[in-house]
Amino acid sequence: MRDIRQVLERWGAWAANNYEDVTWSPIAAGFKGLIPEKVKSRPQCCDDDAMVICGCIARLYRNNRDLHDLLVDYYVLGETFMALARKHGCSDTCIGKRLHKAEGIVEGMLMMLGVRLEMDRYVERELPGGRTSVFYQRKNSLRS
């Protein structure tokens, strides 16, 4: 089972390095260093994985812009829970719950697509007892 937080962290680092060239610029309206360096130095996903995740993020934007903005602020721009809580006018606990909901939606979209990401070998989470997900075991056995 893939760890969606690690997946989104890698996607966020990819997006922060401006591979999309769509939404944000590293230098906008005279503000240098809009994207913090700590975000740029993280491990990234490949372009193919990023395009799949961008599709999920775009669908989330269409259906729930608040959750989309929360994911972008946290994973791309690297804002903290406290900064997000001030921005959204709620507690950091509330931000954690909203972020968890947004992560779950993206994870569900990836599951429904049934795609295997290149980064899965790095972000796979073990289930209790040292087993991997049954979903991946079945999928791999069908390919053999």
From Swiss-Prot:
Coiled-coil regions listed: none
Transmembrane intervals: none
InterPro entries xref list: Phage_933W_GpQ (IPR010534)
Similarity annotation: Belongs to the phage antitermination Q type 1 family.
Example GO biological process: DNA-templated transcription termination
Annotated keywords: DNA-binding, Transcription, Transcription regulation, Transcription termination
Disulfide topology: none
Function (record text): Positively regulates expression of some phage genes. Bacterial host RNA polymerase modified by antitermination proteins transcribes through termination sites that otherwise prevent expression of the regulated genes.
Name of the featured protein: Antitermination protein Q
Pfam families attached to this UniProt entry: Phage_antitermQ
GO molecular-function terms, A-Z: DNA binding
Organism: Escherichia phage 933W
